[in-house]
């Protein structure tokens, strides 16, 4: 099966809101704590080894990185890799800059159609993960959570983590969050959940094409 995400390439790096590209294509943001496996997951989803840089130093990635998706001449969408958060040794000024950059981008970018929130399956929904959800909540746009590194858990532990996270997300819905809140298990190493993640992300990027595919299957 050919995936749209496999046609991804580096587009630009942004350090300030004023530098966001004046593009019109839909965007999907990828967010997560430092060491949640965000860069590795992006690389696996896009079937590339070094598309997103996975730093060995937590908190090193301090910019918003854009990747275009689709034909090089006419990209159809952008993947947006947000700075990892939660690393204690990052200076206070840098943390403040990241928070302003992240919250403003998530709340005001009209091209943004959804957020993929990466959380370590062993430690889901930390305080900072919840803050990301709460920043994004006013938009009413969907959030899909990937519980990464689930290969480090037993099957029963994975099931328990998935159920507990879904229950916590349901509480946001009960409190009035308008957007869809979904979650799945994911392992870049074992490729667990890869097809499900592909299908969901591509349905956000090109819903018309996804509807056509579903209609064709139904026939």
Curated annotation (Swiss-Prot):
Alphabetic keyword roster: Cell cycle, Cell division, GTP-binding, Magnesium, Metal-binding, Nucleotide-binding, Septation
Every EngB-type G domain range: 24-207
CDD domains, sorted: YihA_EngB (cd01876)
GO biological process entries: division septum assembly
GO cellular component, one term: cytosol
InterPro entries: G_ENGB_dom (IPR030393), GTP-bd (IPR006073), GTP-bd_ribosome_bio_YsxC (IPR019987), P-loop_NTPase (IPR027417)
Metal-binding as UniProt keyword: yes
Cofactor: Mg(2+)
Alphabetized Pfam families for the sequence: MMR_HSR1
Binding residue positions for Mg(2+): 39, 61
Sequence positions that bind GTP: 32-39, 59-63, 81-84, 148-151, 185-188
SUPFAM superfamilies recorded: P-loop containing nucleoside triphosphate hydrolases
Matches recorded under PANTHER family: ENGB-TYPE G DOMAIN-CONTAINING PROTEIN, MSS1/TRME-RELATED GTP-BINDING PROTEIN
Family: Belongs to the TRAFAC class TrmE-Era-EngA-EngB-Septin-like GTPase superfamily. EngB GTPase family.
NCBIfam families: GTPase_YsxC
Record function comment: Necessary for normal cell division and for the maintenance of normal septation.
Protein name, entry field: Probable GTP-binding protein EngB
Species of provenance: Burkholderia thailandensis (strain ATCC 700388 / DSM 13276 / CCUG 48851 / CIP 106301 / E264)
Gene giving rise to this polypeptide: engB
């Amino acid at each position: 099966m050919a995936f749209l995400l496999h046609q991804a390439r580096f587009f630009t790096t942004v350090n300030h809101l004023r530098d966001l590209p004046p593009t019109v294509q839909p965007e999907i943001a990828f967010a997560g704590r430092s060491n949640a496996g965000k860069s590795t997951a992006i690389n696996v989803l896009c079937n590339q080894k070094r598309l997103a840089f996975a730093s060995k130093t937590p908190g090193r990635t301090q910019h918003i990185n854009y990747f275009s998706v689709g034909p090089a001449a006419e990209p159809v969408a952008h993947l947006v890799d947000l700075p990892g958060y939660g690393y204690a040794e990052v200076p206070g000024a840098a943390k403040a800059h990241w928070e302003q950059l992240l919250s403003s981008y998530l709340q005001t970018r009209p091209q943004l159609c959804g957020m993929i929130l990466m959380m370590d399956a062993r430690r889901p929904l930390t305080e900072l993960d919840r803050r990301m959800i709460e920043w994004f909540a006013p938009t009413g746009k969907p959030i899909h959570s990937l519980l990464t590194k689930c290969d480090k858990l037993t099957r029963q532990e994975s099931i328990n983590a998935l159920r507990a996270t879904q229950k916590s997300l349901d509480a946001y819905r009960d409190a009035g969050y308008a957007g869809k809140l979904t979650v799945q298990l994911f392992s870049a190493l074992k490729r667990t959940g890869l097809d499900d993640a592909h299908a969901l992300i591509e349905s956000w990027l090109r819903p018309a094409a996804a509807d056509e595919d579903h209609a064709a299957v139904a026939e």
